[in-house]
Amino acid sequence: MSGSNAKSSGTGFGSHIPSIEEKNKQIQQETMMEKLRAKYRNKPKSYEEIKKSVRMYFIEKHYPLDPLCKATLQSALDKLQHYIKVTSRHGLVERLESLSRQLGLKFMEDQQLLFISTDMFYVEILLDAAGSLSDVKVHHECKIEQQSSELVACLKSGDFADFTVQLEGLSSIYQLNAEPKVKKKAFVALQAMETDIQSLYQLHLQGHSGDSYSLMTSSSVGLVLPRRGGHPMRLTYFCPPLHLPEGDPKLASGDFTIDQVMRSSYGLSATINLEGSSANKLQTLPTVTLVRDAQTGLEVPTYAQLNQNNSLLMPATFVLRLNKPMPVCLESLKALGLPGLDSVATPPGPPTTVLNLIVQTASKQAIKNTQRGLYVNLPKETHCYFFTDNRKLQGTLVSSLPFTEPAQVPRIVAFLKKQALFYTLLASCVREQQKQYNDMDSTVILEVTAVSFNQITVELQHPYEESLATVDFLLEDGQPTCSVYCLTNEYELLSQKLTRTARKVVSIPMVIYKLLKCWDEEHEFKLHGAIGPGSGSGAIGGGGMSGGGPVSGVGNNFSQFSMDTPTPSDGSLPGGGFANINNLKMDAKSRSLADAFAASTSAAAAIAGLINLKRETDPQSGSSASGTTVSGSSSSSGSAKTSDHDIADKYKNIWKDKTPNLKHCVSITPIPGDGKSGSAGGVSGVEVQRTGGIEIIPLNAQAAIAGGGVTASSSATPTTITITPITGKDPSKDSTKKSTAASAGVGVAAKRPHESSTSSSSTSGCSGSGSSMSSSASSGSSDTQKEKKRKKKRDDSPMGPPEKIYSRQNSPAGGADASATGGVVRKFSSPSSSPKAGGGGQGLMAGVPTARPSPKHSPVYSSPKHNTASNSPKSPFGTHSPKHGSSGKPSMSTLKSAATAATILSPKGDKSSSAVGNTSSGPSASSGSSGATGLVRSFASVGAPPPPPPIPPLASSSGSISSSQSLKKEKTSSASGSSSTSSSATAGVASGGGISPASVAAAVAALKSSQQQMKSVASLSHLAAGGGLGSYAAPSGAGASGAAAVVVGAGAGAGAGASGLELSALRKGMAGGAVSLMTSTAALAPTIPAPTTTVAAGSAASLVSPVSAVVGQGQETAGAAAAATLATATILQQQPQPGAAPTSSCLTTSGGSSDSAGSINPAGASTEYMVKPSSQEGLKLTINKTGSSKSSGTGSGSSSSSGLQAKAKSSSSGATSFAGSTGSTKKQHTGLKPGVNSGPASKKATAAVSSATASSSKHFFQKANSSGNLSSKLSGSGSGGGIPLTKSNSTNSFQEHNAPRRRPSMGALASGSSGGGSGQRKLGSASGGGSGSSGSVSPALSGSMSQPPPRFDHHTDMMTILQYASPTMAASMEGFIKGLHNKFQIPKLSQRGSGGNTTSGRSTPSGSSEPALAGTSSSILGPIASSTGLTEPEAKPPVPPSQSGNEGLLNLSSTAGTPSADGIDEELLASLAGE
């Protein structure tokens, strides 16, 4: 039964079962209540009567009242009283009576007076006739009455809580166990002590001019708030400056006034009280007098001895009562020697260490000891602190400290300040909410040891060295002083900087955060530090190191992070800041601020940097190409914060394992020319390691410093780079590497064989004219034995490549150009190399390289185009555009021939001659180069395709696929061929009239070979997706990256290739890759059904389907050019697709520089091609000639916009051209016929905004399919100031969205090549910091290397990849992808917007021509890149591109302001932590 009872009670079995007695009581109660109800049911009483009878009942005490009941009843009444608003005299009296009773004080009421009294004092409250308050006086036994304004104020405002506190404070003074005559002296003694302390404080206040903080630290008694009414005197001795008041998060407590500090809830303070104790002699008169020191002239306090006149023996002591209990060290506490400390100093429980107490106190008892790691989540990184307990540091929790003389107060306050500093520093590592991450890889592990009370040591692994680093916090002088100890460096300046930070924030995590940032910066310097401002950029300070904005950090929003020191130890840039500081605000998830910095440079650069790092090359050598490369951000400048060595090692191993046959390296040695070039600055110290391979030596540096990016146009003579194979090992392999450095600025990154790093190429934008950047450096080694064999065959065959070297000047056509550029380009061709344009695009003009015929066995000849082309009457030089074969129309070849004046064709008229645009160095527009597999060398003008061998021209940004090489002959070649070649080849094939199966096969082969590498590079792979196999190619072999494969991507000419390019580019770490990406697809646009294969990156827009290959690229600036070149290279399939509307597609070269066949470009002129499919069979290219101005800048802009618009006849208004870097203005090219400007373009031109902006107006997928604009949108934030989206183009970038992975992350990579006009032109491009070139980065590039590479199989679903890379993107992409079926449906417009930036199109195993989405981002890049290339002198910031609604861009910057999990506003944190 009891069981059922329990159940019925509803609370379950645990419930209490009532006893018999309880039941009886209950029944009695109910009976009584029933009686009461019956009694009053007939004659109801008023409430007053009931109240009276109840009261009478209690008074009569019919039975002994349980005191507990009485207390409960009383407290209930008092609570009620508390909620009654006092509006009348009666209410006031009742409330005061209630308060007095609660405090045990007597309350008396007179007509106008109320008294609240105790034995020792009474409070007199005067009311006026109306019953309102007029005055309050406090009478102490031994003193005359004191009028108390505080008490008046709180009663008038109805603040009875404060009134209560004050009454308590007054009565607490007398809580002594003594007779009244002694007791009454207590207040006198307390006042005497307060007077003395106030005198000491006034002494400090006089000589002090400064803020509340310096006063608080310098004053021996802290900040003193005198007694107010019943509130005791308060000394504020510590307040961490970082804490933000709740009200205004933008105002740090460091800006508080003295009063605010004293009233702040964050401050640590102590009040002076009197407590009962054993007998002590306490002063009853002030004992401090100020005496002027004869020697110093300063006033010094002197303390009078206590004697019978000024003191009294009483059972009391003064105490400093702390507002928050504080863990202190027992040893130090005992050393104070205070009277009566024994009770305080002997902790009740077992002895415990200070660290344990600190952890418990700081976590509010949530964490009991130091056994586990303490996680601290900062904006983009997580730290895990392990406290190492020091058994010697026994501690105790102190809440009050006794003292008896004023002289002891300064000692106690000094002790408290020190303990507070120690406590605050260690407690900064403790969070109440411990979020643990499974992902320990991305967490910085630190060990914190309290060596003593004056020293805290934090140990962590140096992110870039295999060693431990130690940060010591010395607390000797009451201020933290930091020292950093490391194996390799004596960080004196860094230690000073950290000391300033530590004093500002008093937080270990923030100091470590800053330290890691500084190491990141330092690492940047080591890697790319040499890259002084970058040739294009100007004086050393200004050029962005990555070509980005001002390096010095001064102009950046986050300049605080830049190094303050004038020059870092390694002598690199003065500012020491990251060029990219602007990007700091990147999306919070992206790994760390540092990474963000990095991000600002071009992603490609970053990757390149990463890869360079991996190669074990001397970090500087990569950049050595020098500063000039600013553009080079690519080189490594990328502020890419290369990831830590972990990654580097991983990749190193990969390379070691997979590429046994890569034996050569390229060493690049800049030989400073006229001292002006920035390059000379950083590089001089670089040691070149000579290893087999190619050595690239710039003979004189370029002077165009002021030009900002525009080296080419500047009067300075461009430097040439000579590439000589150092070892005879496999010349063919290396030969491809020539780097035509158009401008001295060319930064060639040192390449490791495996890394054909074009990296610098994209960045080179900075170097003004398209420095060849590293572009040329594609690694030569082939990735497979097959290739070797093939090459051998080629070499042996009778028709080897000519050995003769044409210098530009000698070559017939070239004379004019060469002279114009004033640079000589020499081309050394190794026997195997296919006719490569010698291209050093010296000045703007330089771009035109000499071309030589390709060897007969070269794939070129076999390509379909080739066959017809050679006969085609139209191409006098035998060049054919990729389309050539099928079409009867003038094709690239004709364009080229037209360009002859501008271009130099080889005397033999070999087909490969490319019409390299000579215009701005970008000229590499080799677009024309017909069959040859040329890659456009770096932007430089090399147009001629290099042999298929493993040249990863991709890298060269020009890698434009322009050369259309059919892969047919060499399947592997595509892989090995530089990616660009391969891509071009495929493109060529496609254009040929359909892709020949062979080409597909080749692509596949390339893919395969590359795949192995891919795995290692998986991260790059994100890009890949590209349609079909193409995407994979990238990693292939020596970094040839399978660009070719990419191109191959689809029989249909699917744009997939583009993504492949990207991969490869990534692989190379080149910006170029990025470019290709861009191109690849953007325009690819589904609209054009199968035929299009666009590979070229820069001109992504050019993708128009029918358009045949207009590849001309006129890269303006190297950096930009690189990206652009790829784009220009795009090759469209010629076959008209029935479905596709013939659209005029304008391929403007991004550089605009490429010459088109039809016209002759004046030396500097850049041209754009307009392709109109006039008939189904062929396209007609119309070339607009631009003014002869040499400015390289012009071309680029247009290219982006010109993108092809499938539908719009007018083709996008074309890009605006920028005013040449020289400043001469170019005509605007709209891509329409010469006379015509299509509306938007023409308007845009005026803006001279970076190309990125030019296209901004269009939607990504316009009907026209013009991808050009995308770029602008992507480029996202406008120029310099904003944080450009670094990510912008690359969708994929895996910028660590996830947990912060510190060092390795390359988050920074994402940004574009930034190399662009280093500071000068801050194109909107992603590289924010750098010139727009960053845009060129392909998404893949941006992906951060640190992520484990996802593995890609052909079949990997695109969305999966996207998910990996960026969930946001994936979401926006999904609809878009659905729209693209193998059937090439044109996605509805509504769907199109979203796809904008996805990196890769699905990869479909079949070669079907699915357009590769990847392209999209690329297109963006293209324009951007081009713009970067041109750094125009005027460098107007581009107009920020309009952001179309669902562009899918990753706008990292958007999250910048969000508060971190710690609740610290990130901006504020940055400003406080930074200098």
Curated annotation (Swiss-Prot):
Listed Low complexity bias regions: 621-641, 711-729, 738-782, 919-934, 954-966, 973-989, 1143-1159, 1185-1225, 1265-1276, 1334-1346, 1399-1409
Subcellular location: Nucleus
Region span, Disordered: 1-26, 616-644, 709-992, 1135-1166, 1184-1245, 1263-1354, 1387-1475
GO molecular function: transcription coregulator activity
Disulfide cysteine pairs (residue numbers): none
Pro residues biased stretches: 944-953
Amino acid composition bias (Polar residues), ranges on this chain: 1-10, 860-874, 888-897, 1286-1296, 1415-1430, 1442-1458
Keywords, in A-Z order: Activator, Nucleus, Phosphoprotein, Transcription, Transcription regulation
Any single Pfam family the record assigns to this protein: Med1
Role description: Component of the Mediator complex, a coactivator involved in the regulated transcription of nearly all RNA polymerase II-dependent genes. Mediator functions as a bridge to convey information from gene-specific regulatory proteins to the basal RNA polymerase II transcription machinery. Mediator is recruited to promoters by direct interactions with regulatory proteins and serves as a scaffold for the assembly of a functional preinitiation complex with RNA polymerase II and the general transcription factors. Required for activated transcription of the MtnA, MtnB and MtnD genes.
Similarity annotation: Belongs to the Mediator complex subunit 1 family.
Quaternary structure, from the entry: Component of the Mediator complex.
Protein name per Swiss-Prot or TrEMBL: Mediator of RNA polymerase II transcription subunit 1
Taxonomic classification: Eukaryota, Metazoa, Ecdysozoa, Arthropoda, Hexapoda
Gene name, Swiss-Prot/TrEMBL: MED1
